[in-house]
Amino acid sequence: HAEIYVQESSDRAFEEEVMLSGFANADVKAEGQGISYDEAQETFTARYTNETIALAFAITEEAIEDNLYDRIASRYTKALARSMSNAKEVKAVNPLINGLPSGSFKTGDAVTLFSTQHPTIAGVFSNTLATAADLNETSMEQALIDIAAMTDERGLKIAAKGMKMIIPSNTQFTAERLFKSQGRVGTADNDINAVKSMGMIPQGYRVNNFLTDTDAWYIITDVPNGMKMFNRAPLTTAMEGDFDTGNV
């Protein structure tokens, strides 16, 4: 999840962020005329609700009496840590898996995370390909073209750039060829690999083994205030005895 989200701290049950529209393009002021005024607007509110993740195991009183505690506890503790880590990773990829146009994960603007119809004051904008496509040279180049054309809430160009690609393990070999080949992939043409030559997506690709869509791929841009993850309390462990059973 660290490759997807910017992590911030939290000290409450939920966090809210209000999206501001910014201003329209500045106008030329004629000599002697007054300055034109514009108003920034609140467009939508995004809420991040904290959740408590917990899991426990018990060792019987009899196992402790048989001097099995150290042997069992060490193995169980490692397994518990793996379970907690897995839960975090599964939750982290949920927006990516269910944020597709046919999915159920919606953002603060009431549409799915990946949509061609994100509403703005200036109209709509898209953060996904107009026609879904597997990862290849054509689709990756089109995605970078679309990213460069992104606008803000008021329709102003923001000169966004793709920084990093997130992919499932099934696509890693395709990604390696697309990112590392000097020439174009899968063609006899003596052309350079434009993405590599131009230094686009400078952070390369990262494989996320928790993605369940085997042909999905995502590009993280340099646009600020993107994917965020709040951490209210770090992972802690505790040991308590059960009065009724004597288990620990």
Where are these regions (language model features)?
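Short, charged/polar micro-motifs that form catalytic or ligand-binding hotspots
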Residues: 13-18, 22, 43, 47, ...
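Glycine-rich, often proline-containing surface loops adjacent to acidic residues and nearby aromatics
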Residues: 51-66, 121-124, 159-164
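Alpha-helical scaffold segments that mediate packing/assembly in large oligomeric complexes
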Residues: 67-75, 82-146
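Sequence/fold signature of self-assembling virion shell proteins
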Residues: 112-152, 159-164, 170-248
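Assembly/oligomerization interface modules of large self-assembling protein complexes
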Residues: 1-53
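An acidic- and aromatic-residue-enriched active-site/binding cleft used to recognize and process polar
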Residues: 45, 60-64, 85, 92, ...
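Surface-exposed acidic, glycine-flexible loop patches that form ligand/cofactor-binding
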Residues: 101, 105, 153-158
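Short coil/turn segments at secondary-structure boundaries
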Residues: 3-6, 157-163
